[in-house]
Curated annotation (Swiss-Prot):
Lineage: Bacteria, Pseudomonadati, Pseudomonadota, Alphaproteobacteria, Rickettsiales
Pathway(s) it belongs to: Quinol/quinone metabolism; menaquinone biosynthesis; menaquinol from 1,4-dihydroxy-2-naphthoate: step 2/2; Cofactor biosynthesis; ubiquinone biosynthesis
Known function: Methyltransferase required for the conversion of demethylmenaquinol (DMKH2) to menaquinol (MKH2) and the conversion of 2-polyprenyl-6-methoxy-1,4-benzoquinol (DDMQH2) to 2-polyprenyl-3-methyl-6-methoxy-1,4-benzoquinol (DMQH2).
Record-given protein name: Ubiquinone/menaquinone biosynthesis C-methyltransferase UbiE
Molecular functions per Gene Ontology: 2-methoxy-6-polyprenyl-1,4-benzoquinol methyltransferase activity; demethylmenaquinone methyltransferase activity
Family (UniProt): Belongs to the class I-like SAM-binding methyltransferase superfamily. MenG/UbiE family.
Organism of origin: Rickettsia felis (strain ATCC VR-1525 / URRWXCal2) (Rickettsia azadi)
Principal EC category: transferase
UniProt catalytic activity: a 2-demethylmenaquinol + S-adenosyl-L-methionine = a menaquinol + S-adenosyl-L-homocysteine + H(+); a 2-methoxy-6-(all-trans-polyprenyl)benzene-1,4-diol + S-adenosyl-L-methionine = a 5-methoxy-2-methyl-3-(all-trans-polyprenyl)benzene-1,4-diol + S-adenosyl-L-homocysteine + H(+)
EC number of the protein: 2.1.1.163, 2.1.1.201
Keyword DNA damage on entry: no
Example of a GO biological process term: menaquinone biosynthetic process
Gene: ubiE
Binding-site list for S-adenosyl-L-methionine: 68, 92
Length: 248
């Protein structure tokens, strides 16, 4: 049996995506609030820095694991304010999360030039060489087969297209590492229980962060998927990192 990790648990590979879907469906309504509470609002600064990695908004952008649409809508608003001709495709395997993104787009009057597609990062329903940018924020670690998702990212990008990933990473400083681990494993699930009534969802969250490859390990994975000019930038001491790579 082909097994993979669902948090610290070993599960059949074919069952992981369903388990991940269940996690996000159960917390979808409180997802944005929990992000603010867990990160003390820092996730907004991280996403601002992430969006700055796309200087040319006259582009065709695929946002994978789009969730509630934070990244895509941030880019859409910036493009509208600049008068850029952006084309954005928001993709997520969880339909409930994508519905939230659609609602936010309508509320913000950002629905123009947006497409919404329910799809797996491992099997994207797009042609080869379709996009100028592939973005994914806090989503790659939830994919059952990360290597397969990276190869799909490479496939759908145009030559000279850019892959950009924002993901939780490994804290470097020892003086901060112990506190961060305590906060992650003891405080975050407690907040999750209080706000969403689902402690297990946030136990999975912190376990998936703990198991995600280090910055340098993920850099190697990107190279093995075919990418070149691979680099990363740590934010907040390595709590998160922005990974960039090109399809040459």
């Amino acid at each position: 049996m082909n097994q993979t990790n669902f948090g610290f648990k070993k599960v059949d590979y074919t069952k992981k995506q369903g388990l991940v879907n269940s996690v996000f469906s159960n917390v979808a309504d409180k997802y944005d609030l929990m992000n603010d509470l867990m990160s003390f609002g820092l996730h907004r600064l991280w996403k601002d820095e992430f969006s700055r990695q796309i200087p040319n908004l006259n582009s065709h952008i695929l946002d994978v694991a789009s969730g509630s649409g934070d990244i895509a809508l941030k880019l859409a608003k910036k493009a509208r304010d600049r008068g850029n001709n952006i084309a954005l495709t928001l993709s997520d395997i969880n339909e409930e999360m994508l519905k939230n993104a659609k609602k936010k787009a309508i509320d913000l009057n950002l629905f123009q030039n947006l497409k919404f597609t329910v799809a797996s990062a491992e099997e994207l329903p797009f042609s080869d060489n379709s996009f100028d940018y592939y973005t994914i924020a806090f989503g790659i670690r939830n994919v059952p087969d990360i290597n397969k998702a990276l190869k799909e990212a490479y496939r759908v990008l145009k030559p000279m297209g850019k892959f950009i990933c924002l993901e939780f990473s490994k804290v470097k400083e020892s003086y901060f590492k112990d506190f961060y681990k305590f906060y992650s494993f003891s405080i975050i699930p407690t907040i999750g229980q209080a706000i969403t009534g689902n402690k297990e969802a946030y136990e999975y969250l912190v376990e998936s962060i703990e198991l995600f490859p280090s910055q340098d390990e993920f850099r190697i994975m990107l190279k093995e998927a075919g990418f070149e000019e691979v680099s990363y930038k740590n934010l907040s001491g390595g709590i998160v990192a922005i990974h960039s790579a090109y399809k040459i």
